[in-house]
Every structure is written in C-alpha cells, then in structure tokens.
C-alpha cells in the first residue's frame, strides 16, 4: 500500500502492505483516498464534508506515519489509521460512515472468507498457505484438498468451537492454538507406535487382517503401511523403534538357513554348519538392505490424507534389546539405515539428495561413544551421516537417565511423554495391548492430546518492564492457555475407537472394542497435553536488557520456565491429566507472532525488530557463541522443558572433518539430553551446483533463494534442505522463517 521511504542511509525503499490473503503488495495512497471519498459522498452528510485537499492530507498523513515505522502493515492496521485520522479531523459524520462502510464490507467478507481463501488456494494465490508447511507442496491437488478442509476447520474452530476470548487471543498472537485446521475433527497430536504388538500379534489395515510377518522384508513392508495409516488418522508426528523390527532378522535367518539346507542337500552338495551359516548370513544382509530400502522409499513416496509424506521418526537404541544375537541384529539394521541415508535418494533428475523423512534418532551410550567401544563403528557412521544428510539427531542415554530415569524417544519431532506413572499406580493395561508387561514401564502406544503455546515476548512487552505486572500478566495468560488446553482435552472426550481403527482397535495405540470411547487413555498419565512456549530469548532481553546466556538473564529465564512448570503441576494434580511444558517448534507461526508483536508494540531493538521470534528456550540465532558453550548453556533448560525440547548447533560442511563431529557427539553425550547438528545440503538443477544455496533480497525486499554459481532463483529448479525446527524441510518457508534461517550464525 505505500509508495517509498528513505532508510537511515537515505536509500529509497518501497513500502508494502500485507493483504488478507497474505500477499505482499506495494501500498497505494489513492486507495485510501477512494475509500474516504465514498464515505464523504454519502447523502447523510450535509455539513462537515471533507474537501479533496483534506482527503489527500489524511492519506499523506497515514503514508508518513507508515513510512516512519519501517515495517509492513496489514490492511486492518491501515484501516484503523484511517478511522483515527478521520476522528482527529473532527469530521465525525464522515468517520461514522467510514466505520459503517468498513463494517459492512467486513460482514460481506466474513460470509465469503472461507470461499475466498479456498479459491486463493486453488489459484495458488494464498502466500500464507503456500508457505505454511515446509513439507507440503501446495501445487499438488491432494495437498490443496487438505488445505481447503483446513481452512474450513479453522473457521469453524474460531467461530463455534472456541470461546471468543481464546479465539481472539489466538488471532492477536497472544497465544497460539495449534492445529486448528484439524480441530473440527476429534484427532490427537503425536505418539509412539506400539509396532511390537502389531507385528508380533497381528493387526488389521483398512479392514484386512495382517498376520505376523514371516520375514524381515515383510515386516518392513507392513511397518510402512502401518505408518501411512497412522499418519492419516492424526495430525502430529509418530515414532517407531527399530528394536521392534529386530526380531524379524532372525526369523529371516532361520527361514533362509532352512531353505538353503534343503536346496543344497537336494543337489548333493556337502556343507558344514559354519558354511551354511556363512551363506545364510550373506543372503540375510541383502534382505536387511532391501527391507531398509523399502522403509526409506515407501515412507517418502506414500502420501497420507493430510497431503504429505508421513511425519515419522525412526528410533535407534541398542540397549532397548538384550545383549546377544538380537542386539547384533539391531546393530545390523542401524548400520544399514545409516549407509542408505548417507547415499540419499534420487530426485526425478536422478541426483542423490537428502530426504526429509524418516527423521532418525540415535542414542549415544557407554558402549558406542568412546573409541574402541564395541559399537563405536555405528557412531562413526552416524557422524558421517550427520555431516552429509543432517541426521541422525542424538539422545544421550546418560543425561536422559538422569532426567527421566529411563530412555525412550520423542513423538515425532520433540514431544516427550511423561515418565510412566499409571503402571506404578497399578492401573494396569487400560489400552488392552497384547504385549503389556506389568513389570515394565510403558511408552509405546502412548500419545499427546495437543498443544497451546504462550507468546512470552508479548507477555513481557505488555508489562512495560514492570516485573510485578509481568508476573500478573503471566498468570492471566497461563490460565488462558489452561482453558484452551481444556478445550483440546474436552474435544477428545467421547471419541469412539471406531474413528481410527488402526489407532484405537488394531494395536497402534490400543486394542479397544468397537463402540468404546478413548476417555480412560486421556487420564492417569497415559497421554500428555502440552503447554508450549516461545520467545524466551526476547522475553528475557526485554525485561533485563541481557541475553539469557548472562548470569542475570539466565536467572530470570529460569524463573519464567519454573512458572510454566508450576502451572502444569498445579493443573495435573487438580485434574489427573499430565500437563507438561513443551518447547514449541514454531514454523510459520514465528512470522505471525513477530507481525502481531510489531503491530502491538512497534519496533523494539532485539525484541520485535525481526520477522521471527526465537523458538522455545533457544539462544537467539544472531548471538555469537561456540557450539560447545551453546549446548552447555541450553542443557540447563532442558529439565525445565520436560514435555518437549531439542537443541541444535549450526555447523559448516563437516564431511571432511568427522573427528570434529565426533567431538560434538561426545559433548552431547556428557552434557545434554537431546540435540542435533544443522548443516546445508542443497542442489541446483540448472547448473549442478552442490553446496549452500544463498538467501538474498530481491528488488522489492523479499527474501528469495539464489544459486551462488549460476544465479538461478527458480525454486522449482533447486533442492534446498534446511532444518525447519526439529525436522528437515524441503518445500521452502515463509518470510519470517526464511529470515531466521538466513540469520543463523555458525557455531563452529
């Protein structure tokens, strides 16, 4: 909507407005003049009409005000400025008619808002939706269908399902009610799949019974089918463990030995047991390779009903199975998975690139982290894989035992279950799984009910740096989040097991009967529900003037985090629901929060003056700090984020410096529960460049991706892989997240 303004260097920049569709367009003063003129021309006005010069003056006044702010404005903000300017002139009749004119248009827009958004999705004109999820391609028909359904669900959620104050707080960026595009239906967030029960005891997929697999390769195929079905029945991520596949390696081993023994005997070949075992092992290795390849390719080529490949994590933990042949078989699977991921997968041009899924998590433990350890060779492979493909991520067995008393994976990206308390309480097998063992704690088959996030930056800025006021605001906002979380919980109450048989009846999460409700699984700590938080870095900086890496900043940050945990403990004790604190992985919402903050508080240096805010407890991406210090300092916050946390360090190309990667892994093992290394893995299809594709500004100030070798800016002709939050994105990002990616400083 603007023309141009001068920055501090007297350089001319065009000013822009963000339309309701999310599209960024040049601001035109004549649109303001035209809207005011319509109100001014109404028959009801006899006196107090505005002259054409006065109308032009108002438009110029708004232009100057917007110019001085140095940021983009939304259409609604511009209209607010017009109303204020009209009232300031004393021409109240014109102002009232303009407000009425605006309200009438708003009502007409309201009646067709969903229709317009759906049309903009189909026509590929909705910038917000196009960059909402970095693993969804908005051009594809099936993805568009999911987005269309999501727009209706958002509307229905805001208008009918949520209390007005919660919906308004969400729209204003005070809190974030996650996944409202799925809230119309009774779906949960993320989970740990009880693959062992399904594979060992049989399951059903789309009404067809599946017997326990008779080979490793079949088990891999069935696993891929289960993952796809689960992904279509929930909106969050899922995790399965390779430990549940490991027993089928020996099933294949015995099957191969039996077949070879028969075949060799039939042709009269004499052989020893060792020779037979050697031949069988060679064939078995090929089957393991084939099975792992099946999982890799099926999981990135299958598409769930939510318009993307399943958001799935594969867990690799050697101590999850007993010592002996079973552990050796698990090690073989892990080794094979690493080798195949290092190779990558071919894109349609036949070039090996980095796949987004499955995300891999490898546990660092006392027999794989030191040179000379029995399984050190796997950690070396993991380091090479990280340097090339940005996975696996790492959990420290040592630190997780200290924090939770056990080792188990996160659900998808970073959401962790609370330690099992229902087994200790003697509540028993409420999910009726066929592999329940009352002598062990249970994690696979449990899930998360959903997330609501508090914007810590807004709470801080709303206080005006008054600490007493800050804590009052925090208490109010936390109770708002609590009520929003209750909405999530109550939405799931009464859900029939029939809505998702793969989850509730056939073993992924439970084996309930048709017609039964899932209500018992929502209490007693079987599932969790998450209080998310974002912007701790900016919150602390605003209130203290320091980073939370400083002693004073850290002390205040710890108090903020403790207040979140205290709230969750209070709610949990009162309701018998496991509320937990979750470090929110804002993706597109980081841009929304930033824009809402700028609208409410203007540009505050190092607080609201960027188009993103910092995820969870993370140190600001613009802060200079080395990798080891970053991990050490952030490790202090992970115990205060028990429902979800992950830390990362940004590193250059490490493929020729694996010892440095190993050094970081050793530091992770000794220091922090859960961490990852971010590298770059890009490819330009125009010139074949393999390296880091750059983020640059185009002539309008928009951030775009450019090949440093040939200058290609066509996103359809490049493969860019970046860590979005806790997972890898490959479909590009909105302007806020892109700016955050650009600003990330290297830590090595």
What does each of the following model-derived ranges do?
Residues 104-525, 546, 550-709, 713, ...:
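Conserved catalytic cores of very large enzyme subunits
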Residues 2-122, 742-747:
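Charged, amphipathic alpha-helical regulatory modules used
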Residues 288-289, 296, 542, 737-743:
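Metallocofactor- and cofactor-centric catalytic cores in central/energy metabolism, strongly enriched
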Residues 28, 702, 724-727:
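Conformational switch/transducer regions in large eukaryotic molecular machines and scaffolds
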């Amino acid at each position: 909507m603007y023309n141009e303004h001068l920055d501090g260097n007297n350089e001319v920049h065009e000013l822009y407005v963000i339309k309701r569709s999310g599209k960024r367009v040049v601001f035109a003063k004549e649109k303001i003049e035209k809207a005011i003129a319509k109100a001014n021309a109404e028959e009801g006005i006899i006196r107090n009409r505005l002259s054409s010069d006065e109308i032009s003056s108002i438009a110029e006044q708004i232009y100057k005000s917007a110019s001085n702010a140095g940021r983009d404005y939304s259409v609604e903000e511009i209209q607010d400025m017009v109303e204020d300017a009209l009232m300031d002139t004393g021409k109240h009749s014109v102002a009232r008619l303009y407000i009425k004119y605006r309200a009438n248009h708003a009502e007409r827009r309201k009646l067709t808002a969903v229709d317009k958004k759906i049309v903009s999705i189909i026509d590929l004109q909705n910038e917000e939706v196009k960059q909402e999820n970095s693993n969804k391609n908005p051009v594809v028909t099936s993805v568009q269908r999911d987005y269309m359904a999501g727009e209706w669900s958002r509307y229905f959620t805001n208008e009918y399902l949520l209390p007005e104050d919660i919906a308004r707080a969400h729209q204003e960026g005070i809190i974030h009610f996650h996944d409202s595009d799925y809230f119309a239906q009774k779906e949960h967030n993320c989970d740990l799949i009880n693959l062992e029960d399904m594979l060992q005891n049989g399951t059903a997929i789309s009404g067809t019974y599946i017997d326990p697999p008779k080979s490793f390769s079949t088990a891999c195929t069935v696993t891929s089918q289960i993952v796809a079905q689960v992904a279509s029945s929930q909106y969050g991520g899922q995790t399965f463990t390779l430990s549940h596949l490991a027993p089928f390696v020996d099933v294949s081993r015995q099957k191969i030995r039996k077949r070879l023994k028969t075949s060799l005997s039939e042709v009269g070949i004499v052989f020893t047991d060792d020779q037979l075992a050697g031949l069988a092992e060679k064939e078995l290795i090929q089957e393991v390779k084939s099975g792992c390849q099946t999982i890799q390719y099926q999981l990135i080529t299958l598409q769930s009903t939510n318009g993307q490949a399943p958001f799935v994590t594969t867990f690799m933990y050697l101590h999850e199975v007993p010592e002996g042949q079973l552990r050796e078989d698990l090690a073989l699977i892990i080794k094979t998975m690493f080798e195949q991921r290092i190779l990558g997968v071919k894109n349609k041009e036949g070039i090996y690139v980095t796949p987004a899924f499955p995300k891999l998590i490898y546990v660092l433990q006392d027999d794989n982290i030191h040179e000379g350890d029995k399984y050190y060779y796997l950690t070396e492979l993991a380091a090479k894989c990280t340097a090339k493909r940005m996975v696996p991520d790492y959990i420290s067995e040592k630190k997780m035992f200290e924090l939770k008393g056990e080792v188990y994976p996160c659900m998808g990206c970073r959401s962790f279950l609370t330690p099992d308390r229902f087994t200790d309480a003697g509540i028993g097998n409420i999910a009726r799984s066929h592999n329940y063992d009352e002598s062990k704690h249970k994690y696979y088959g449990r899930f998360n009910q959903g997330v609501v996030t508090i914007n810590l930056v807004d709470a801080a800025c709303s206080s005006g740096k008054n600490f007493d006021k800050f804590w009052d605001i925090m208490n109010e906002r936390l109770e708002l989040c609590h009520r929003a979380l209750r909405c999530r919980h109550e939405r799931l109450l009464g859900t029939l097991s029939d809505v998702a048989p793969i989850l509730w009846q056939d073993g992924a999460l439970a084996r309930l009967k048709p017609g039964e409700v899932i209500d018992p699984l929502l209490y007693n700590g079987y599932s969790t529900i998450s209080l998310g938080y974002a912007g701790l870095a900016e919150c602390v900086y605003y209130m203290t003037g320091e980073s939370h890496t400083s002693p004073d900043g850290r002390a205040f940050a710890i108090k903020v985090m403790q207040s979140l945990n205290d709230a969750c403990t209070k709610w949990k004790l009162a309701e018998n629901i496991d509320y937990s604190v979750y470090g929110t992985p804002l993706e597109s919402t980081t841009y929304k929060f930033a824009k809402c903050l700028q609208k409410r508080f203007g540009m505050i240096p190092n607080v609201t003056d960027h188009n993103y805010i910092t995820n969870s407890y993370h140190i600001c991406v613009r802060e200079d700090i080395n990798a080891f210090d970053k991990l050490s300092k952030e490790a202090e916050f992970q115990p205060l984020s028990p429902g979800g946390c992950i830390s990362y360090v940004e590193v250059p190309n490490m493929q020729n410096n694996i010892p440095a990667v190993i050094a970081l892994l050793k530091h992770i093992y000794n220091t922090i529960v859960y961490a990852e290394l971010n590298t770059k893995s890009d490819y330009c299809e125009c010139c074949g460049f393999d390296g880091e594709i750059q983020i640059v500004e185009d002539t309008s100030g928009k951030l775009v991706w450019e090949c440093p070798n040939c200058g290609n800016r066509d996103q359809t002709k490049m493969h860019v892989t970046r860590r979005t939050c806790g997972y890898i994105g490959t479909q590009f990002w909105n302007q806020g997240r892109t700016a955050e990616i650009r600003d990330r400083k290297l830590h090595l």
